[in-house]
UniProtKB/Swiss-Prot annotation:
Gene Ontology MF terms: peptidase inhibitor activity; serine-type endopeptidase inhibitor activity; toxin activity
Record keywords: Protease inhibitor, Serine protease inhibitor
Role played: Inhibitor of serine proteases. Can inhibit trypsin but is ineffective against chymotrypsin, papain and elastase. Strongly inhibits the trypsin-like protease activity isolated from the third instar larva of P.truncatus, and also inhibits more weakly the trypsin-like protease activity isolated from the third instar larva of M.sexta. Protects the plant by inhibiting proteases of invading organisms.
Lineage per the UniProt record: Eukaryota, Viridiplantae, Streptophyta, Embryophyta, Tracheophyta
Protein name as annotated: Trypsin inhibitor HSTI
Domain of life of the source: Eukaryota
GO cellular component: extracellular space
Free-text tissue specificity from the UniProt record: Detected in seeds (at protein level).
Length: 18
């Protein structure tokens, strides 16, 4: 129940970088 939040943050950061 912790990696789920990490994955969402990673996806949001990737979209901003792209």
């Amino acid at each position: 129940r912790g990696w789920g939040s990490d994955e969402k943050k990673d996806r949001e950061e990737e979209x901003e970088q792209q």
